[in-house]
Amino acid sequence: MADINPRQSDTSKFPDPVYKETVLRPLFDGAKNHHVDGFRRIDRAHLVMLRETGILDAETAAKIAGALEDIDRTIEPSELVYTGEVEDFFFLIEKELKARIGVDVAGRLHTARSRNDIDHTLFKIGLKDKIDTLTAKARVLLKALIDAAERNQSTLIVAYTHGQPAQPTTFGHYLSAAIEVLIRDIERFTEARHIVDLSPMGAAAITTSGFPIDRARVAELLGFAAPLRNSYSCIAAVDYTTATYGAIELMFLHLGRLIQDFQFWTSFEVGQIYVPNSLVQISSIMPQKRNPVPIEHLRHLASQTFGRARTMLDVMHNTPFTDMNDSEGETQSMGYEAFASAGRVLDLLASLVGQISIDPERVDQNIRRSCITITELADSLVRIEDLSFRQAHEIAATVAKSVVALKGDLPNDGYQPFLGAFSGLTGRETGIDEEKFRQIVSPEHFVAVRSRFGGPAPEPMREAFAAYRGKLGAFEAEAQRSTNHEAAKAAELAEKFTALTGAR
């Protein structure tokens, strides 16, 4: 038995029933759920190019165009059930073409192309649309953050480091930090889209074709910026996938940190963020509870999005530099789940940011009892009393410890400890009276004197808001240019394809 050639004795027929159910059916369903329009556009653009270059004559092109139109009219993709009669969605369309116009004419549509370049083009068409949808939502969030920051440019909050009260700043200043990160995240998406926006069509299997194809024309008709130059890269490179999901991963890692702060700031012990009733749920047993659970949902959805994007990168890891299924159908469909949860986060976070507010009484209480304006006392001693910062820091630290020990607050209970600490270290009396002391340690003064570039004082914040709105405007303008380009090329493709049918 060992001497029998398995190739000669093999009587099995494709597809194996287990393979059909575990691989082919999910791939077929993924294609019909996500890529029908992409297949349609690719077939039409390729056909127009074949006719324009003279590879196909007018009569043949017209027959194929008519058959493609008839398939659109008579087949509802959502109702298709995979039977195993054909390998995949591509071969289903080819089968339907053959049934309408015969094997010879139908087969000519596949001249100078392969499922390799078709597949990567499909995935790029799908990713471009999803990137555009997601970045539109990111721009809505960016606007919501800018609006909230401007509304709160003078609203005091406690800023934390290492989980402890550190210094006062404004909510507008804090949100502006998140704005700048989001701007960079959107820029990463823009760069990823530039990579996606290069057409693989015309690479065929690996090395292009001996036919006089026009790759740039197909790219243009499909709305791409240009063809991707190297044909091997067209079918082997996965950086369009890794760039996209890398951008998602980073955006939702960063947003997750903002969300975590919001969760902390709404806790009873901190309480500096107030969440309105419309975004609060109650307990089924504890009458006093106001649970801001949308923030919890934001946190886990951001983490899910991060995890899904990370999974896409993990799947690409250590794969061969060639065309391979690891980067294709099912993997691409899996990645779309990251876009779905990402969109939910962006929508909900934009709504939340527009509705939350700062509780000024809690902020004032937390500032007073935590002595977080004490840094300015040290700075003022350097400027007013000509001490070294280390001397000033020692005096300020002594004052803070005394106030905390008294369970008091710095403006009301800090002056007497300050007098003792100052004279004890310097051997002289201070020129700062109690009124001046109160001014120095007030949070309003703390913010006002931090007027350098990037600080929370009004002047640098006004400059910052102008810069942020400029960035938002630039993002909107670029998105509109892309939308106009895609629409114009879609219209041109429809016009050129329709013209083919006139030769019948």
From Swiss-Prot:
GO cellular component: cytosol
CDD domains: Argininosuccinate_lyase
Enzyme Commission code(s) on record: 4.3.2.1
Compartment annotation: Cytoplasm
GO molecular function list: argininosuccinate lyase activity
Pfam families to which the protein is assigned, alphabetical: ASL_C2 (PF14698), Lyase_1 (PF00206)
Pathway where it operates: Amino-acid biosynthesis; L-arginine biosynthesis; L-arginine from L-ornithine and carbamoyl phosphate: step 3/3
Matches recorded under InterPro entries: Arg_succ_lyase_C, Argininosuccinate_lyase, Fumarase/histidase_N, Fumarate_lyase_fam, Fumarate_lyase_N, L-Aspartase-like
Gene Ontology biological-process entries: arginine biosynthetic process via ornithine; L-arginine biosynthetic process
Entry superkingdom: Bacteria
Parts of the chain that traverse the membrane: none
Keyword Lyase in record: yes
Reactions that this protein is recorded to catalyse: 2-(N(omega)-L-arginino)succinate = fumarate + L-arginine
UniProt keyword list: Amino-acid biosynthesis, Arginine biosynthesis, Cytoplasm, Lyase
Family membership: Belongs to the lyase 1 family. Argininosuccinate lyase subfamily.
Database matches in NCBIfam families: argH
HAMAP family with a match to the protein in the record: Arg_succ_lyase
Name of this protein: Argininosuccinate lyase 2
Organism: Agrobacterium fabrum (strain C58 / ATCC 33970)
Lineage: Bacteria, Pseudomonadati, Pseudomonadota, Alphaproteobacteria, Hyphomicrobiales
